[in-house]
Amino acid sequence: MSIERTLTGRASRHVLPDGIIDTQSHIYAPDFPVMPGGPGLPIGMPDEKQYRRLCSWLGISKTVITVANAYQRNNDCLLHVLREFGADARGVAAISPNITDQSLMALIDQGIVGARIMDLHGGAYNFSHIKNLDQKTSANELMI
């Protein structure tokens, strides 16, 4: 199924401040399959290029991308998108409370600034993980 999206047009009558940040988005890349335990991919999901076009039209210059529940504990799609977007994007990843310091630093080096906790059905890490995860994230100045 294809969804027709308006990604460009007349300039908005509301001018956004320079440097405005979209602080919550999910991006699905077709080369990354869903993981067991999570929901499926959205029908007619927008891709990276569509999202970038929309941001350009709206005047959004930076973004924070959150790993989607469809990918569960697999951050590969998120890290791919961060590489594609470069300095204009940061990420919120699914981070195990048992992650090694070395693995956590590798995520930070790739643009991860926070850990996702999702207590709804299909979330990779729920609130039962928050105490142990908080110790790891706060020590590295990450958001949770």
Each PLM stretch: what is its role?
Residues S2-E4, Q72-I144:
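Active-site gating/metal-coordination segments in enzymes
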Residues S2-R73:
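An N-terminally biased module of ancient metal coordination in phosphate/nucleic-acid-related enzymes
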